[in-house]
Regions:
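Positively charged n-region of N-terminal signal peptides that target proteins for export
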Residues: 1-4
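C-terminal motif of bacterial Sec signal peptides marking the signal peptidase cleavage site
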Residues: 13-16
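Bacterial signal peptide processing site
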Residues: 18-20
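Short cysteine-rich clusters marking metal-coordination/redox-active sites
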Residues: 37
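Cys/His-coordinated zinc-binding microdomains
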Residues: 41
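Short, non-ligating residues that shape and space the ligands of small metal-coordination modules
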Residues: 46-49
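Mid-length scaffold segments of soluble, non-membrane domains
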Residues: 62-102, 107
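Beta-strand-rich cores of mature extracytoplasmic or soluble domains
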Residues: 100-149, 154
């Protein structure tokens, strides 16, 4: 009897875990007065340049906000930060009409599918060079050709660039 009960509990537990994994990720949130950068504790509306938001497992309504793309990458690599990341969104700079205020018409894209222009000299929201995310590879390549820099994917982002 105990073995049967344990088997039934195990089946339900595994089923619940599988359902949680198969649920769609949370949708990106728009930047508001309550969007505060994880590292700088400043309101994101006060900064220009691309932004990022990370949703952790079990917290679908509470994104972790980032004032820069480099900060977001740092968060994913630093050992002291949470690793239960559900989804990451970044600003699609290919669809921004006002680069001095990308918050006004932000389109969010999956960070792992984005193309990043690095080493372009672009100064982000915290006054330092930052990566520029694009949802379209051709737009990223055109930007890099016109303004300088190179295009990399999420998994190819060099640690030396993130932490310099």
């Amino acid at each position: 009897m105990k073995k049967t009960l344990l088997a039934i509990i195990a089946v339900f537990a595994l089923s619940a875990c599988r359902q949680a994994e198969e649920a769609p990720p949370p949708l990106p949130q728009q930047i508001s007065d309550r969007s505060v950068g994880h590292y700088c504790s400043m309101n994101l509306t006060e900064h220009n340049g691309p932004k990022a938001q990370i949703f952790l497992n079990g917290k679908p309504d509470q994104p972790v906000w980032f004032s820069t793309i480099k900060q977001m990458f740092g968060y994913t690599k630093l050992p002291e930060e949470p690793k239960g990341i559900r989804v990451i969104y970044v600003t699609d700079m290919g669809n921004v009409t006002d680069w001095t205020n990308p918050n006004a018409d932000t389109e969010w894209i999956d960070a792992k599918k984005a193309f990043y222009v690095i080493d372009s000299g672009f100064i982000g929201g915290m006054g330092a060079e930052d990566a520029l995310p694009f949802g379209n590879k051709e737009q990223a390549e055109k930007f890099a050709k016109d303004k300088g820099g190179k295009v990399v994917g999420f998994d190819d982002m060099p640690d030396a660039y993130i932490f310099k």
